[in-house]
Every structure is written in structure tokens, then in C-alpha cells.
């Protein structure tokens, strides 16, 4: 959600892009914001219905009226699903890397961030590594990390705990 701090719960640009893509191509593309995912994870359900999506949009707008963006992000990070029964960044750090969140490096954080897209797929380390590179590239492109941080994190093997044990 590259415009998380700029929108008020619903990213109109992503929504229009998603609708056009879904109407004019054979592929589907989502437009959920972090705010909408918090709604789905905590307030509604995983149903893939238009009714739920509209409810998530409404809830996201309401959350932005009563919560700061950092509070919404914290709710997301504490409840996101990462596969292997790991809900939240703290549990993900423990399950995948055997560490506390505060001990994770940039490469590990990017790998966890990438896993939220499709946890079942990214349980496989090779797939998780591919997704991690995409996350790091986007972070670099948006100016969240420097050239040096990008190169170092991209070069990190980032092994899962199960590969070390």
C-alpha cells in the first residue's frame, strides 16, 4: 500500500486501476489498502463478496476518523497472517527466523512483508525470496531505503529458521 499515509482508507487510484484491469483483462487485481485489510482481519470476514468489500471500505474510512495511520498500521502488523499459524509480525519473526521483531534486519522484515500477499505460496523459501526482492525494490523505488541498504538486503540469503536448525 504505497500510498498508505496519503489516503483516508480507500486508495481511489488503486481502486480504478483494479476495476479497469478486472473488466478488460483475464486477470484479477486487488485494491485493498492496509486499512481495508485491518477491517477484513478484525471486523468482517474473508468472504470474497462485493458486500464485504464495500463494508471494508466503509470501515476503513471510519477507522481513519478515529485512529492515526500509525495506530492502523500497528493493528495490521499485530494481526496479519503469515502462514504456519503465525498471526502478527512478532509471531512471524519467531516462527520464520527464531527472533524477536526488534532483532530482525531489513532483509527479514522485507521477507515477512512480502509473505502477507499470499502466505501459502511464500512458505516456500525460494518463493519468499523472490517476493522479498520485489518488496525491497519497491521500498528503494519509493525512497524508504538507500541504495546501499537495498544492495545489502537483496544480497542477504535470509534463511528461515527451519533451514538453519
Task: Cite the ranges covered by each PLM segment.
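Flexible, acidic/glycine-enriched loop-and-adjacent beta/alpha segments
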Residues: 1-34
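Non-catalytic, structured segments within soluble enzyme domains
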Residues: 30, 34-165
Amino acid at each position: 500500500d504505497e500510498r498508505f499515509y496519503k489516503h483516508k482508507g480507500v486508495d481511489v487510484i488503486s481502486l480504478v486501476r483494479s476495476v479497469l484491469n478486472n473488466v478488460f483483462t483475464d486477470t484479477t487485481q486487488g485494491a485493498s489498502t492496509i486499512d481495508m485489510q485491518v477491517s477484513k482481519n478484525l471486523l468482517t470476514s474473508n468472504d470474497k463478496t462485493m458486500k464485504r468489500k464495500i463494508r471494508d471500505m466503509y470501515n476503513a474510512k471510519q477507522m481513519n476518523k478515529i485512529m492515526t495511520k500509525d495506530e492502523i498500521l500497528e493493528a495490521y502488523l499485530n494481526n496479519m497472517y503469515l502462514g504456519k499459524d503465525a498471526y502478527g509480525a512478532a509471531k512471524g519473526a519467531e516462527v520464520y527466523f527464531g527472533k524477536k521483531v526488534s532483532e530482525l534486519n531489513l532483509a527479514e522484515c522485507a521477507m515477512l512483508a512480502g509473505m502477507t500477499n499470499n502466505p501459502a505460496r511464500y512458505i516456500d523459501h525460494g518463493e519468499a525470496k523472490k517476493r522479498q526482492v520485489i518488496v525491497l525494490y519497491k521500498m528503494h523505488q519509493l525512497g524508504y531505503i538507500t541504495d546501499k541498504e537495498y544492495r545489502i538486503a537483496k544480497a542477504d540469503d535470509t534463511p528461515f529458521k527451519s533451514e538453519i536448525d
